[in-house]
A protein has these predicted regions:
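N-terminal helix-rich structural modules
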Residues: 33-236, 240, 668, 725
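Short His/Asp/Glu-rich catalytic/ion-coordination signatures at enzyme active sites or charged loops
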Residues: 52-67, 116-138, 158-200, 259-299, ...
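Bacterial N-terminal signal peptides
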Residues: 15-25
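C-terminal, non-catalytic "cap/extension" segments appended to globular domains
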Residues: 40-63, 255-257, 386-388, 408-412, ...
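Short pre-active-site segment immediately N-terminal to the catalytic Zn-binding motif
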Residues: 489-508
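Active-site-proximal, well-structured secondary-structure segments within enzyme catalytic domains
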Residues: 171, 175, 207, 214, ...
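Bacterial N-terminal signal peptides that target proteins for export
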Residues: 3-16
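Cleavable N-terminal signal peptides
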Residues: 29-30
Length: 725
């Protein structure tokens, strides 16, 4: 997953209602917000000047929780001064004194915010959460005050209207058109009174998004399954039990503790033979944020959906999705929904055939009835064993984390792009589990820094993602500092970190995002790296997943952690053959979440406040995805992607991007597979380009034609010819 909350704002000029400049503070009211004394900011703050560490990497060993708030406030205040100077420049507007000046603004803010965003997502604590609560409405006001600045927009519009006569190079012309469209989308053409209404909506939205995230993090932590009865853990491996015991010990509890993942289904359900335990864990997951307690998210999300509809109406759109998709590849919610709707019949039909396979098992207990979702993973694993003669416990010893990283992820990057990696233990990190690598070009030229933070923690958001601490820009003279975060099960002390093949795929996926950021080769930060539409940003990451099962790569990293022996060819073949196993279920749960997202965000402003349970049931029926044994991958109440992480009206992007990546991989296979020439061409024509040209044209030029949906259906085993395999 690509974290978009910051990237939607990345290099957009912002303003704030809090002013703190070089230790001299002043405040003004921002709506009805509670005022807070400003903290001092000066040379002792680690964000005061650009970091002197390699690549300007943050000095995490020097940064204290108390440093973030004054640095963020000072950064916003400084950027406001810079932007006001641009807006009030007495000289006629030019590309240099307006667009380039805007691209240079906000560097202090970026330094502080990027590091703050990293730690609050991956290593938060109560003090950071307070800062987050305090800053959330201010960052919304910060953006609005500039997006809605009449003088600034007048200069932007003047240059936009004259762009054809300015002899701009292609990237500069793209910047003019992109920024103009973004300002219009943000409401620059609204009346003054409507701008004030929009500011209040944006402020409330930012506050509620932060509230949702905090509630969900606490709800997910509280939902962990605790037991002192070892019989309830029957089916788990010794390593899994040891990790659960370590988890309990870390929480000062007796017995074992199984933390919740962010998805509806939980990995341990595939192994637990105790049906009562499975059902209890599933219930913990399903109802984690709907218990009527302080962590219940339903009221928060219902208001978020409502105010987003109100915001869209104010901006002249029938619903939020119609507004939000204007700059995406899909363009309209109707196009996105048609795309999803076309996939539903094949996915649900395949899921139904998979349900029949489960019902045919000799030890299936449900009396011939459809499988209960709490039992699906366990019995699907039995089908996997019977059908492919292997289970996940057999393969994990061949997927030791460090081996997968160095001989899989890094190996593929070397074969395709010539990259090499050197661990930098001298650089500070935000948590002891984090590792840092310097990345080099084939000729030894430094390219980037890359951090990886792979193990689950209570104070870390669920899921996996990529983001940047420093973005690439020729204008600013910066190279990328990028990080990947995941939530793999941390082994007991002295034990190896053994992964499932899904975990392996996640590593390749997130590193695909990292490559997109590291290969950025653009002038302007607003167009650099992963600053692309949602339905394109997942394409490079999902494309990189394919190399996890590519024979030459797989054989290189799939080695037993004790003996170093390669995975037996027969077992490896079974894994590859089983790639389409359970894809009916997997794809149906993804489509259900995608359609649910679109249903929430196509509500008109006139719709009343929704009851999430009723809305969800009706939405799934309406989209033909009310399948009793396949719940959505995310229930509305814990769908963090759409309520806080920038994927609102955009979760379809994963599937849209999958169409692009499957077609792209087919191109590689048709042109010689994993070769340096193919990798360099892909890097040059796609990965390095960021948002410097129309993404559809960029993709079509590289591919040599428009994408087709057929490779997606084939790779998921959803064509009729694939069903019996």
């Amino acid at each position: 997953m690509m974290h978009l909350q910051r990237n939607l704002r990345k290099r957009r000029v912002l303003a704030t209602a809090i002013f703190v400049v070089l230790g001299v503070a002043a405040t003004r009211t921002c709506g009805a917000q509670t005022q807070k004394p400003a903290s001092s900011f000066g040379p002792s703050n680690p964000f005061y000047a650009p970091s002197t560490r390699p690549f300007q990497a943050p000095a995490f060993d020097k940064i204290k929780d108390s440093d973030y708030e004054p640095a963020i406030d000072a950064g916003m205040a400084q950027q406001l001064i810079e932007v006001e100077a641009i807006a009030n420049n007495p000289a006629p507007p030019t590309f240099e004194n307006t667009f380039v000046a805007l691209e240079r603004s906000g560097q202090l803010y970026d330094r502080a915010w990027n590091a703050f965003n990293c730690v609050t997502q991956a290593n938060t604590d109560p003090e950071l959460e307070k800062v987050q609560d305090y800053e959330a409405p201010r960052t919304a006001a910060h953006q609005d005050a500039i997006d809605l600045n009449t003088k600034l927009f007048a200069r932007i519009k003047t240059i936009y209207d004259e762009r054809a006569s300015l002899s701009l190079d292609a990237e500069s012309l793209r910047l003019v058109e992109y920024q103009y469209q973004q300002f219009v989308k943000a409401g620059a053409n609204l009346s003054d009174s409507d701008k004030e209404k929009l500011k209040k909506l944006d402020e409330e939205e930012s506050t509620l998004e932060n509230t949702f995230m905090t509630k969900l993090l606490d709800a997910t932590t509280a939902g962990a399954y605790s037991t002192t009865d070892p019989s309830t853990l029957a089916g788990l491996s010794a390593g899994q039990k040891a990790a659960a015991a370590e988890e309990a010990n870390a929480h000062k509890q007796q017995g074992w503790l199984l933390p919740l993942q962010n998805t509806t289904q939980q990995p341990d359900l595939a192994f637990l033979s105790d049906r009562a335990a499975r059902h209890e864990i599933f219930e913990h997951s399903w109802n984690r944020a709907e218990r009527g307690d302080a962590n219940d998210t339903r009221t928060t999300l219902a208001r978020l959906a409502q105010l987003r509809a109100e915001k869209a109406a104010l901006l002249g759109y029938p619903n939020y999705a119609a507004w939000n998709l204007t700059d995406q590849m899909a363009k309209t919610p109707e196009a996105a929904i048609r795309f999803l709707d076309a996939l539903v019949p094949a996915a649900t039909a395949k899921a139904a055939s998979e349900a029949k396979e489960i019902q045919a098992l000799g030890d299936y207990p449900n009396g011939g009835a459809a499988p209960d979702p709490a039992d699906w993973e366990f019995y699907a694993e039995q089908v996997r064993k019977a059908k492919f003669d292997y289970d996940q416990a057999q393969v994990k010893p061949y997927f030791e984390l460090n081996n997968v990283l160095e001989k899989g992820v890094f190996y593929a990057a070397n074969e395709l792009y010539g990259l090499t990696f050197k661990e930098r233990k001298d650089l500070p990190v935000w948590q002891p589990d984090v590792r840092v690598f310097e990345v080099f070009e084939a000729d030894g030229t430094p390219l980037a820094l890359w951090y990886c933070d792979y193990f689950k923690r209570d104070n870390k958001n669920g899921g996996a993602w990529e983001d940047s601490l420093v973005g690439q820009s020729k204008l600013l003279g910066t190279l990328p500092v990028v990080y990947n975060v995941a939530n793999f099960e941390k082994p007991a002390p002295g034990e190896p970190a053994l992964l499932s093949f899904d975990d392996v795929t996640t590593m390749f996926h997130e590193f695909g995002h990292a490559l997109h950021a590291m290969f950025a080769n653009t002038v302007y930060p607003s167009l650099s790296g992963t600053a692309v539409p949602r339905d394109f940003v997942e394409f490079p990451s999902q494309f990189n997943e394919h190399w996890a099962s590519y024979p030459a790569v797989f054989a290189h990293f799939a080695r037993h952690y004790k003996t170093g022996e390669s995975m037996p060819a027969e077992l490896a073949a079974k894994i590859v053959k089983a790639k389409t196993f359970n894809q009916g279920y997997d794809f149906t749960e993804i489509l259900a979440a995608s359609e649910l997202d679109m249903q929430w965000h196509t509500l008109p402003a006139s719709a009343p406040l929704q009851d999430p349970y009723t809305f969800e049931q009706e939405a799934l029926k309406r989209t033909h995805l009310s399948v009793s044994y396949v719940p959505p991958r995310y229930r509305s109440s814990y769908f963090l992607h759409i309520w806080q992480e920038g994927y609102q009206a955009g979760y379809y992007a994963y599937t849209w991007s999958e169409m692009l990546d499957d077609d792209a991989f087919q191109w590689f296979e048709d042109h010689g597979g994993m070769t340096r020439a193919n990798g360099d061409r892909f890097r040059r024509m796609v990965l390095s380009r960021g948002n410097t040209e129309d993404l559809e044209k960029m993709y079509d030029a590289w591919l040599g034609g428009e994408p087709s949906i057929e490779p997606l259906l084939k790779n998921r085993g959803l064509t009729e010819a694939e069903w019996g395999k």
